[in-house]
Amino acid sequence: DPRVRKQYIQEQGAPIVIKADGLAAGKGVTVAMTLEEAYKAVDSMLVQGDFGSAGCRVIVEEFLEGEEASFFALVDGENAIPLESAQDHKRVGDGDTGPNTGGMGAYSPAPVLTKELQSIVMDSIIIPTVKGMSAEGSKFVGVLYAGLMIEKKSGMPKLIEYNVRFGDPECQVLMVRLESDLVQVLLAACRGELNGVSLKWSPGSAMVVVMASKGYPGSYQKGTVIENLEEAEAVAPGIKIFHAGTAFDSEGRFIATGGRVLGVTAKGNDLEEACDRAYLAVENVNWPGGFLPSGYWLESSTSETSMLERE
């Protein structure tokens, strides 16, 4: 009942977080800074049905101030091994503003997830979850994705949600850094043989910038032509363009078929170099029907925020 939800929201006050309880392609969360925003989010889910069956139930959560980070582990039912850290940015606008999306960019490693915090996450969140599921007779095998908030007040990680998949676009930056054979590691997970397995990662950093169809995450035009992708990949070392929503038209040209269309990914000796290379590649993609934020937020290890401006 929307009225019950709104009454509870009024009692709790803003800021507050409103979530669709089902799968909503990464767009089912509203961080409402005012009561009006929260009420509007409830109506969009429960009255207007914007998320279909995914929004038939609504979760109201406490607002936590801090930095979000993504933590991934491979699980074989009893054992879990961590992947490298990553951090994505979901808002569509310049300077990490605007509505949430499935993710407009990511980088790895995430400075906010120090080695000490990663150990805490494994010991206090991942391993207890894996052991608990096994004890209940529901062993989990696969990729466990913990959405975390590194709380500003305490500096400690809090679990916001679980997914059982790789993140998009976090997967892109992880895969270009992974030097181990992913197939063999996944097979080891399937066979219950992860105990003692370790992963090898390339040094340095990786960054992905998502190019989306104009209008996303709202309505957008499909079928716009994308050109110069091979040339864009060749402008600097370590660049890989991942396709998410593309197809060939009758003339053999790439066209956009979705909202988030390209993941322009680059490796570098550090985060700044990876960022420079990714944006250099983006500038060489010829796609009038696409867009991306003109600036990208990078969080330092001291949580101070800087912005690399792009023309």
Curated annotation (Swiss-Prot):
Any one GO BP annotation for this protein: 'de novo' IMP biosynthetic process
Record's protein name: Phosphoribosylamine--glycine ligase
Pathway: Purine metabolism; IMP biosynthesis via de novo pathway; N(1)-(5-phospho-D-ribosyl)glycinamide from 5-phospho-alpha-D-ribose 1-diphosphate: step 2/2
Alphabetically ordered keywords of this record: ATP-binding, Chloroplast, Ligase, Nucleotide-binding, Plastid, Purine biosynthesis
SMART domains linked to this entry: GARS_A, GARS_C
Gene3D superfamilies given in the database record: ATP-grasp fold, A domain (3.30.1490.20), ATP-grasp fold, B domain (3.30.470.20), Phosphoribosylglycinamide synthetase, C-terminal domain (3.90.600.10)
Entry keyword rRNA processing: no
Family, similarity comment: Belongs to the GARS family.
Domain of life: Eukaryota
EC number, UniProt record: 6.3.4.13
Enzymatic reactions: 5-phospho-beta-D-ribosylamine + glycine + ATP = N(1)-(5-phospho-beta-D-ribosyl)glycinamide + ADP + phosphate + H(+)
Chief place of localization: plastid
Principal EC category: ligase
Coiled coil segments of this chain: none
Single GO cellular component term: chloroplast
NCBIfam families according to UniProt: purD
Organism lineage string: Eukaryota, Viridiplantae, Streptophyta, Embryophyta, Tracheophyta
Record's keyword annotation contains Chloroplast: yes
UniProt domain ATP-grasp: residue ranges: 1-191
